[in-house]
């Protein structure tokens, strides 16, 4: 278990060459590791421990445990509003009086570990696609200029090679930028779709799960319906049928304890809060990208903010002469180059790059 969790550390290592931003990494790396960790913990609890334990007379316990785990257990929703110890033995546990429509069945618990695993894979997909699209371009053109451990002659040679690449490949990076922004947009779509599917998975209880917990946090336990216990009940019921000695059908009503749901309820509280935080960050990021794309006057200020050593005149000149793809490339270069080298390269690049058609028309 510890070895499996330790192997996830590699996904959180600092990147010496950055081709994305912090929010993108939070979605692709941190959330992937978070979901995989939750999946491993629940898997260990489910298959190493005892996920269900049922009380019943006249039937071997392991038979009932296996049956109720494979099929499903249920509660009576109206019993959650009754006082425990007086009206009901446990929250949601009461006589069903043969009313099948009044029962709330729980079938999700055996699938939680698999669902979390596939959620993790879905969160990693944008990073996988971007790595394929990017193809190591940034690392190739940086050529180690992000570190200072090289001779002066070597620095100058690499700087000239970088400048030569930028001049020869003007107007060839629009697809590079579009693919990255598409991957960022995919992150936002992924979170929205996952939240919708989780809400369906938990019968419409996920989207309001965290807010219900916060609303009732100050209400005494005996005066409220605990949302965590309602969505992840710790004690449920299960009906087991078998044939008696004479062939008559016998019904056995069992009380089942689900210790796994204690882990599930805490896991999904954290996931609920994290997904909402991540969704807000991703929406803000998309709005920010929209400002970059549709507000050209915003680009010089952003370029200058990334490296204060570059004069605003040079930032304006580059933003005016370059299309959005080339501008994005030099903006990302600022995160990967030594600031002094970056200033020299951008100053020389601004002198040598030809103005765009729009700029010449002016």
Swiss-Prot record:
Residues 1-28, 132-177, 289-362 are cytoplasmic. GO terms for cellular component: basolateral plasma membrane; gap junction; membrane; plasma membrane. The chain crosses the membrane at residues 29-49, 111-131, 178-198, 268-288. GO terms for biological process: intercellular transport; monoatomic ion transmembrane transport; phototransduction; phototransduction, visible light; visual behavior. In ovary, expressed in follicle cells. Expressed around the periphery of the embryo during cellular blastoderm formation. Repeating epidermal pattern emerges from stage 11, high levels of expression detected along the borders of each segment from stage 13. At stage 13, expressed in the dorsal branch of the tracheal system. During stage 15, detected in a few cells at each of the branch points of the dorsal trunk and at low levels in cardioblasts. In embryos, also expressed in the salivary gland and the hindgut (at protein level). At stage 17, expressed in the dorsal side of the CNS. Its main location: membrane. Structural component of the gap junctions. Essential for generation and/or maintenance of postembryonic neuroblasts and normal development of optic lobe. This is Innexin inx1. It comes from Drosophila melanogaster (Fruit fly). The lineage of its organism: Eukaryota, Metazoa, Ecdysozoa, Arthropoda, Hexapoda.
């Amino acid at each position: 278990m510890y070895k499996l969790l330790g192997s996830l550390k590699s996904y959180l290592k600092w990147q010496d060459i950055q081709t994305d931003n912090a929010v993108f990494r939070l979605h692709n790396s941190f959330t992937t590791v978070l979901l995989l960790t939750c999946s491993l913990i629940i898997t260990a609890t489910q298959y190493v421990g005892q996920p269900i334990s049922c009380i019943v007379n006249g039937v071997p316990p392991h038979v009932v445990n296996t049956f109720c785990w494979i099929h499903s257990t249920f509660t009576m929703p109206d019993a959650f509003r009754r006082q425990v110890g007086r009206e009901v033995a446990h929250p949601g546990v009461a006589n069903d009086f043969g009313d099948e429509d009044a029962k709330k069945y729980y079938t999700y618990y055996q699938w939680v570990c698999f669902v979390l695993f596939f959620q993790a894979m879905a969160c990693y997909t944008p990073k996988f696609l971007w790595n394929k699209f990017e193809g190591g371009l940034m690392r190739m053109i940086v050529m180690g200029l992000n570190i200072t451990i090289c001779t002066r002659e070597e620095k100058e040679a690499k700087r000239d090679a970088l400048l030569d690449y930028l001049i020869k490949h003007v107007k060839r990076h629009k697809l590079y930028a579009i693919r990255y922004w598409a991957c960022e947009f995919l992150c936002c779509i992924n979170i929205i779709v996952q939240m919708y599917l989780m809400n369906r998975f938990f019968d419409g209880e996920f989207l309001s799960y965290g807010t219900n917990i916060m609303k009732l946090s100050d209400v005494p336990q005996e005066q409220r319906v605990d949302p965590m216990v309602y969505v992840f009940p710790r004690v449920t019921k299960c009906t087991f049928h078998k044939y008696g000695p004479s062939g008559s059908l016998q019904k056995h009503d069992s009380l089942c304890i689900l210790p796994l749901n204690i882990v599930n309820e805490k896991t999904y509280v954290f996931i609920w809060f994290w997904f909402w935080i991540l969704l807000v960050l991703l929406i803000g990021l998309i709005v920010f990208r929209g400002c970059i794309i549709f507000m050209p006057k915003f680009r010089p200020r952003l370029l200058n903010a990334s490296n204060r050593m570059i004069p605003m005149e040079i930032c304006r000149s580059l933003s005016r002469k370059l299309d959005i793809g080339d501008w994005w490339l030099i903006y990302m270069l600022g995160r990967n180059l030594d600031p002094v080298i970056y200033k020299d390269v951008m100053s020389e690049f601004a002198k040598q790059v030809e103005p765009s058609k729009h700029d010449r028309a002016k």
